[in-house]
């Protein structure tokens, strides 16, 4: 799983700073991070595509994808497979 890399992209994209380092696989994202609004989701998707060299279609994404850091990392890993 790409947990640490996804976490770093998330921290950089949302400008979470040192507080972002506390995020764990089971840390809730959507609805829990005020920085992760609808525009930030779009920006984050672009950053993940660029960093990991993947393509993410709108149909691939659901709220459960962004439920936790672990679910987001698992999604990225699956896209890379």
Kindly label every feature range from the protein language model.
Residues 42:
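Conserved catalytic core of two-component sensor histidine kinases
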Residues 1-20, 74-81:
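Thiotemplate assembly-line natural product biosynthesis machinery
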Residues 15-36, 53-62:
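Phosphopantetheine carrier-protein modules
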């Amino acid at each position: 799983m790409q947990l640490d890399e996804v976490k770093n992209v998330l921290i950089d994209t949302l400008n979470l700073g040192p507080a972002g380092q506390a995020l764990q696989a089971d840390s809730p994202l959507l609805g829990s991070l005020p920085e992760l609004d609808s525009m930030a989701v779009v920006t984050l998707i672009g950053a993940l595509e660029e960093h990991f060299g993947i393509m993410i279609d709108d149909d691939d994404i659901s709220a459960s994808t962004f439920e936790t850091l672990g679910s987001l990392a698992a999604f990225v890993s699956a896209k890379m497979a």
